[in-house]
């Protein structure tokens, strides 16, 4: 989960090479890549250089050529046959090299000494040119992935595999699906180049290990079952899921065994009977560690404190470190499958709340939410806030998750459990000792009770099923309603001088706030998610924090996630990568287009998690709840045409609409009904659900033939066909397309690599990649592109198929 940069470590070959020609070495220098799980070996650039020379020597001997020696350069990469380069470069070679190739063509064919000499000179020039590219600042992770995929030279692949260690972790993580897909479906040389980096990162990060294990399983599922069982991807996945890649010599923080002030957390005072996974690590603050069935290491109730400490230390390393998290995810998926069997939304919602209440009995634990970007432990799921989302056949659901941020997930102790009826103290943080928690104790609360996941069955679904449904009651007492710091109290404490504010300013601001306060949605039994999604995120965080027993802690955070069962999110992940790349391109080219890529976690070929877009509801929900047109809703939410709030929201709408129109055109996104288009509180639109892209469409009906969805309601919000904002929209479309085609290779390679060995419907047909490239219109002038944009906008506005598809969705699913 960290963002540190791993520098490549020097590696000594297993045997010292001789001083003779590379071809005379006893063994392949590429064997320095270790296949085992012992100490990780990294390919040194010097070794990669010699490996390249070895490959060259073998090919030269087959063609009757002469080996090229290293002329003092740190690394010389060469082509395979001396004539046609097998290394695909991003740009054409310099003109001088091209001229030399033309001049020496006949000489090389005749095999004369002069031709051979020129060939060696040409190879040296090519090597020097490629080396300069690899060592330049322009050589980024995108180029590295491109060379790794396209090159047929084992030496080049080995060098790129070593260079992965030089890039930032987050840059490589973006291409993790591509790296693992190449590892699964491409030849052994590519896999050998990638594996050292993957193994090294798995040792460093438990979250990276989980991501790799999940993706390896999902992308191996397209293989035949007999092949899949013995594939490299399956073997690497088993290695990651075992405990062999656990970081060496790393110990977790031990729970404090010294006497501490009464925190209300000792086992004798708990009102809830923990499962046996909790008993594994339960510690009485007034006695020694007690023997339990799931802790065989403890042999005597009267052991000394030192032996108790040793036993706990040993128990930390006993379970497989990914097991609790995998069981946590499995529990969430099992809930979704059970919900899908219920007929009505109301029944699904009630069952969801009950299931999550049971799940809370297992928390806190050494589990985390993989969609988050920081280290944390999950401590509680506010079950009454969960909602079932709209779906005709399945039951995706949205949950909110309370976590405590920590410096290091592996080494920080799991937070102590605080019973539901011990909600935070009132008025201010200074009053917390009234609830039994001092300031010092609060800072060290992570070490009060050890982690509860030391049992292999810490997150077994069967164990959850044995628990009784126990909906906690929230008592209103002096500890219930923490801290409503009034403005008066803050002012009196912090401000030494009076602050004078003009009464007119106060009246004006209050009137604007009243006029532009976002409206709340009414509760709809058929769509319970509308109310939850409409509530402002900050208000939701404040409300949940006030009702949480962990809310007083300074490192408390609230996260949210959508759990989906029965849906293949691999296409969603591909779309996320393309959107993220386009977003980066437009930022780099300073084109003010706005899109919102949301994180995707692929769990298997038919399940996953999605990061929700906060402060956003679907256009379908907007129209159903408000019974207004889109323009009238904007006026209701943001004020009249001339207010700053409306103009800002209108600009946001235009910039996001232009961005997503280009995304929909380039990726051929289908199923664009109003349930799959969100509108946020600032006026942006956000497209969701990229299940139909490129070569696939819903039920292959072929309804949506326009380049993108642009309705008359969208144009009305922009100010009409003659408005300045509509012209601004078309200008942004043109600028965005020009910027995107400058970086076409970065976008195309994301899709092209994932097509390797894939059975996803978006890759059906042999022309998927060719058609994608054609949509960038590389041969068109800017004037021709402008005409193309005008035609696409006009065609999309007048598209009868868009209206037909919206009508079809209304009749079949009730989507407005």
UniProtKB/Swiss-Prot annotation:
Changing residue 449 to G: In DFNA87; uncertain significance; unable to rescue defective inner ear phenotype and sound stimuli response in zebrafish morphants. It is an enzyme of class 2 (transferase). The modification N-acetylglycine is found at residue 2. Residues 41-67 are annotated as: Interaction with ACBD3. Interacts with ARF1 and ARF3 in the Golgi complex, but not with ARF4, ARF5 or ARF6. Interacts with NCS1/FREQ in a calcium-independent manner. Interacts with CALN1/CABP8 and CALN2/CABP7; in a calcium-dependent manner; this interaction competes with NCS1/FREQ binding. Interacts with ACBD3. Interacts with ARMH3, YWHAB, YWHAE, YWHAG, YWHAH, YWHAQ, YWHAZ and SFN. Interacts with GGA2 (via VHS domain); the interaction is important for PI4KB location at the Golgi apparatus membrane. Interacts with ATG9A. Phosphorylates phosphatidylinositol (PI) in the first committed step in the production of the second messenger inositol-1,4,5,-trisphosphate (PIP). May regulate Golgi disintegration/reorganization during mitosis, possibly via its phosphorylation. Involved in Golgi-to-plasma membrane trafficking. May play an important role in the inner ear development. Belongs to the PI3/PI4-kinase family. Type III PI4K subfamily. This is Phosphatidylinositol 4-kinase beta. The gene is PI4KB.
């Amino acid at each position: 989960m960290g963002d540190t940069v791993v520098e490549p470590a020097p590696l000594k070959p297993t045997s010292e090479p001789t001083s003779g020609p590379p071809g005379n070495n006893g063994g392949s220098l590429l064997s320095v890549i270790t296949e085992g799980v012992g100490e990780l070996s990294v390919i040194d650039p010097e070794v990669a250089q010699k490996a390249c020379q070895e490959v060259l020597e073998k090919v030269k001997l087959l063609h009757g050529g002469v080996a090229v020696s290293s002329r003092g350069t740190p690394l010389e990469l060469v082509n395979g046959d001396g004539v046609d380069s097998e290394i695909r470069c991003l740009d054409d070679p310099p003109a001088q090299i091209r001229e030399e190739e033309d001049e020496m063509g006949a000489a090389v064919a005749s095999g004369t000494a002069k031709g051979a000499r020129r060939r060696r000179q040409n190879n040296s020039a090519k090597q020097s040119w490629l080396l300069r590219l690899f060592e330049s600042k322009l050589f980024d992770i995108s180029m590295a992935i491109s060379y790794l995929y396209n090159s047929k030279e084992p030496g080049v692949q080995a060098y790129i595999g070593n260079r992965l260690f030089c890039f930032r972790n987050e840059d490589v993580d973006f291409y993790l699906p591509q790296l693992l897909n190449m590892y699964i479906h491409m030849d052994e040389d590519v896999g050998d180049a990638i594996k050292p980096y993957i193994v090294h990162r798995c040792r460093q990060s438990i979250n990276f290990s989980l991501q790799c294990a999940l993706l390896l399983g999902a992308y191996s599922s397209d293989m035949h079952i007999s092949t899949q069982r013995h594939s490299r991807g399956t073997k690497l996945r088993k290695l990651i899921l075992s405990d062999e890649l656990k970081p060496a010599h790393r110990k977790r923080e031990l729970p404090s065994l010294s006497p501490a002030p009464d925190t209300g957390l000792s086992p004798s005072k708990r009102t809830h009977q923990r499962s046996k996974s909790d008993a594994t690590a339960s510690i009485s603050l007034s006695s020694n560690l007690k023997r339990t069935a799931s802790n065989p290491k403890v042999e005597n109730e009267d052991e000394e404190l030192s032996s108790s400490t040793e036993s706990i230390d040993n128990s930390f390393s006993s379970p497989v470190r990914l097991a609790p998290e995998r069981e946590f995810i499995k529990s969430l998926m099992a809930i979704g499958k059970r919900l899908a069997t219920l007929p009505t939304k109301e029944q699904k919602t009630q069952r969801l709340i009950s299931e999550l209440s049971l799940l809370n009995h297992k928390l806190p634990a050494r589990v985390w939410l993989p969609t988050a970007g920081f280290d944390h432990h999950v401590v509680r799921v506010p079950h009454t806030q969960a909602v079932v989302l709209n779906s005709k056949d399945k039951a995706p659901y949205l949950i909110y998750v309370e976590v405590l941020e920590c410096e290091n997930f592996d080494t920080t102790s799991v937070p102590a459990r605080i019973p539901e009826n011990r909600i935070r103290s009132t008025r201010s943080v200074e009053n917390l000792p009234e609830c039994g928690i001092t300031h010092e104790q609060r800072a060290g609360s992570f070490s009060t009770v050890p982690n509860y996941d030391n049992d292999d069955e810490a997150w077994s679904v069967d164990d959850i099923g044995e628990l009784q449904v126990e909906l906690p009651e929230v008592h209103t007492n002096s500890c219930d309603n923490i801290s409503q710091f009034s403005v008066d109290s803050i002012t009196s404490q912090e401000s030494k001088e009076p602050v004078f504010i003009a009464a007119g300013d106060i009246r004006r601001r209050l009137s604007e706030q009243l006029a532009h306060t976002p409206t709340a949605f009414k509760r709809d039994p058929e769509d319970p998610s509308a109310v939850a999604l409409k509530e402002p995120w900050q208000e939701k965080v404040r409300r949940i924090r006030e009702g949480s027993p962990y809310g007083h802690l300074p490192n408390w955070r609230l996260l949210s996630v959508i759990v989906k069962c029965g849906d293949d999110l691999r296409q969603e992940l591909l779309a996320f990568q393309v959107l993220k790349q386009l977003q980066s391109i437009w930022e780099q080219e300073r084109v003010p287009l706005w899109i919102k890529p949301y994180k995707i976690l692929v769990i298997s070929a038919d399940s996953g998690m999605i990061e929700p877009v906060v402060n956003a509801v679907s256009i379908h929900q907007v129209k159903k709840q408000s019974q207004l047109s889109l323009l009238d809703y904007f006026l209701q939410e943001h004020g009249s045409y001339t207010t700053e709030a409306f103009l800002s929201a209108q600009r946001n709408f235009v910039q996001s609409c232009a961005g997503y129109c280009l995304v929909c055109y380039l990726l051929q996104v289908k199923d664009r009904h109003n349930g799959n288009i969100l509108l946020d509180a600032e006026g942006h639109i956000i497209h969701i659900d990229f299940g139909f892209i490129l070569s696939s469409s819903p039920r292959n009906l072929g309804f949506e033939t326009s380049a993108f969805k642009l309705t008359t309601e969208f144009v009305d919000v922009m100010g009409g066909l003659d408005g300045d904002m509509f012209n601004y929209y078309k200008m942004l479309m043109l600028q965005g397309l020009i910027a995107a085609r400058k970086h076409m290779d970065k976008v195309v390679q994301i899709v092209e690599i994932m097509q390797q060995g894939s059975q996803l419907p978006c890759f059906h047909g042999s022309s998927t990649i060719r058609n994608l490239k054609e949509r960038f219109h590389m041969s068109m002038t800017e004037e021709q592109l402008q005409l193309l944009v005008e035609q696409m906008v006009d065609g999309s506005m007048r598209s009868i198929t868009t209206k037909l598809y919206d009508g079809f969705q209304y009749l079949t699913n009730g989507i407005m």
